[in-house]
Curated annotation (Swiss-Prot):
Homodimer. Molecular chaperone. Has ATPase activity. Residues 1-341 are annotated as: A. It comes from the Bacteria. Signal peptide: none annotated. NCBIfam families: PRK05218.1. The gene is htpG. It is found in: Cytoplasm. It comes from Helicobacter pylori (strain J99 / ATCC 700824). Residues 548-621 are annotated as: C. Pfam families: HATPase_c_3 (PF13589), HSP90 (PF00183). This is Chaperone protein HtpG. One of its GO terms (molecular function) is unfolded protein binding. The keyword Nucleotide-binding applies.
Length: 621
């Protein structure tokens, strides 16, 4: 087979250009990424050797080998893992595939240090090698294939694939280093980077180098060169080590390698259980949200091992989805090694491990919540996703309610439900909340006026998930939740009803509102809960479903709502006497637009609003 030339996808070209010309902040991470990829390939081969009958007799000792040539300025990373065939090479090294390249590019901030830290998190680690290499040669042979292939590229838009000769399965990557990066072809540089980032990769990493010694004395002294191969990492599964053997730095370094994250974790939970079930867990709470936190196709951050043998890193059932930000390891002594992913979903052992793990993680979050400053670091990136647990995790609902924070209208800050309850007024029977799309608009809502008169605080909820989960939360500590916009809540305020004579008085004006706004609203009602506001847009029909659709990224058609009017307001009292139909129509539209501004903060037809406003002003002057 002759060499076949391919062109990188557009996004890969952008990425390569970025790697080569921009991300210079932390070049050494390329080695961490390539070693991590090699470790993943070994994990996958181990799993296949357990589950594929054809591979059960394969005689191989998983390892990673590094070598270099300082004269030729090359560095080679070799593993005997699962390997790749031609289609794998095209998919993984030439196209976006599952690499997350597009998301990576959209997440870039322009800060080189921050951007370089994103490389591994977005699964584009292989391409980081182009930060130091002018050319890369990949030779690989898939464990299930007889044919090996070579992939070659200088990172300038194209790559070549050809057949090659390779006896053992696995992948060998040779980097032809740039002149300014030739120091990476050095024993001490490689050793230092591996110890910094890959000390606890659970496979041995060997470094081949030439050791120079001198023998003899005086004129007989001569230089003797000897090729050596040393293991340069511990190759220990850190989670299986005793806590007493580990320091904070060990946990931090393992996290950065495991999670492809240069930042330090907020916290970690290392737990070993012995008894009827035996398992070890090591979970990390990151300090920043992963890029795919709110994507349906998010990648699980937890790996499952059985007796230190990797099983899967793609099972979203290991932890509930509202804890998808957690990174870490579950290692069971009781699950069968050949367990399938289908069996995992119904396995009682794993269900027990999951249940206990959730409680451990929530307890750690509770510990963080004792310190407001630290808790803010957790809650800002992860508070929204934690709320999702209210919808599905009934077992831990009370604990989750304790951990959530809500914006208090009275205090002007985020508070716990416990704090809210401590400040309940003497006759207050409920916890009131108001839903909306924007916190600033909620603060200005006319609905809050009557609650303020009573001295009742209202929690302002502006996350899209709120309208989806809150209707399913009935109470906290025996105190019911009430939507402040609902009629039941307004009745609790003891508002005066609108008398029949007032309704008769406004009958014609309401009809005028309905005729002018027939394409915009569902109807018009007089309201007893408005004080200073003239008008208010009422509830959205099927608000729960609409917000669920927004959460899923679906477009939600504009639905018609009720317009509520304040019969006691001076403007409406004046409109009762307005006989100029054209002017009345302009006033009606201005009042409706004002109510829409309070609801949405914007108008879909600002031009017409401006024309009506100018017309009214002209007549008033």
């Amino acid at each position: 087979m002759s060499n076949q030339e391919y062109t990188f996808q557009t996004e890969i070209n952008q990425l390569l250009d970025l790697m080569i010309h921009s991300l210079y902040s932390n070049k050494e991470i390329f080695l961490r990424e390539l070693i991590s990829n090699a470790s993943d390939a070994l994990d996958k081969l181990n799993y296949l050797m357990l589950t594929d009958e054809k591979l059960k007799g394969l005689n191989t000792t998983p390892s990673i080998h590094l070598s270099f040539d300082s004269q030729k300025k090359t560095l080679t990373i070799k593993d005997n893992g699962i390997g790749m065939d031609k289609s794998d090479l095209i998919e993984h090294l030439g196209t976006i595939a599952k690499s997350g390249t597009k998301s990576f590019l959209s997440a870039l901030s322009g800060d080189k240090k921050k951007d370089s830290a994103l490389i591994g998190q977005f699964g584009v680690g292989f391409y980081s090698a182009f930060m130091v290499a002018s050319k890369i040669v990949v030779q690989t042979k898939k464990v299930t294939s007889h044919q090996a292939y070579a992939w070659v590229s200088d990172g300038k838009g194209k790559f070549e694939i050809s057949e090659c000769v390779k006896e053992e399965q696995g992948t060998e990557i040779t980097l032809f280093l740039k002149e300014e990066d030739s120091h990476f072809a050095s024993r001490w540089e490689i050793d230092s980077v591996v110890k910094k980032y890959s000390e606890h990769i659970p496979f041995p990493i060997f470094l081949t180098y030439t050791d120079t010694k001198f023998e003899g004395e005086g004129d007989n002294k001569k230089e003797v060169k000897e090729e050596k191969c040393d293991q340069i990492n511990q190759a220990s599964a850190l989670w299986k080590m005793n806590k007493s053997e580990l320091k904070e730095k060990d946990y931090k370094d393992f996290y950065q390698s495991f999670a492809h994250d240069n930042s330090e974790p907020l916290s970690y939970i290392h737990n070993k259980v012995e008894g009827s079930l035996e398992y070890t867990t090591l979970f990390y709470i990151p300090s920043k949200a992963p890029f795919d936190l709110f994507r349906v196709d998010y990648k699980s951050g937890v790996k499952l091992y059985v007796k230190r043998v990797f099983i899967t890193d793609d099972d979203k059932e290991l932890l509930p989805s509202y804890l998808r930000f957690v990174k870490g390891v579950i290692d069971s002594e009781d699950l069968p090694l050949n367990v399938s992913r289908e069996i995992l979903q119904q396995n009682k052992i794993l269900a027990n491990i999951r249940s206990a793990s959730v409680k451990k993680i929530l307890s750690e979050i509770e510990r963080l919540s004792k310190d407001n400053k630290n808790y803010h670091k957790f809650y800002e990136p992860f508070g929204k996703v934690l709320k999702e647990g209210l919808y599905g995790d009934f077992e831990n609902k009370e604990k989750l309610l304790e951990l959530l924070r809500f914006y208090s209208k009275d205090k002007g800050e985020w508070i716990s439900l416990k704090e809210y309850k401590e400040n309940l007024k003497e006759n207050q029977k409920s916890i009131y909340y108001l839903l909306g799309e924007n916190l600033d608009l909620l603060k200005a809502s006319p609905l809050l006026e009557k609650y303020a008169q009573k001295g009742y605080d209202v929690l302002l909820l502006s996350d899209e998930i709120d309208a989806f989960v809150m209707p399913g939360v009935n109470e906290y500590d025996k105190t019911p939740f009430r939507d402040a916009s609902h009629s039941e809540s307004l009745k609790e305020l003891g508002l005066a009803e609108i008398h029949d004579e007032v309704k008769d008085q406004f009958k014609d004006l309401i009809k005028a509102f309905e005729e002018n706004l027939k394409d915009e609203i569902k109807g018009v009602e007089l309201s007893g809960h408005l004080t200073s506001a003239v008008a208010l847009i009422g509830d959205e029909p099927n608000a729960m479903m609409a917000n669920w659709m927004r959460q899923m990224g679906q477009s939600v058609p504009e639905s018609k709502k009720t317009l509520e009017l304040n019969p006691n307001h001076a403007i409406l009292q004046k409109l009762l006497k307005c006989e100029d139909k054209e002017q009345l129509s302009a006033f009606i539209w201005l009042l409706y637009d004002g109510a829409k501004l309070l609801e949405k903060g914007a108008l879909k037809d600002a031009k017409s609003f401006n024309e009506r406003l100018n017309s009214v002003l002209l007549k008033a002057l």
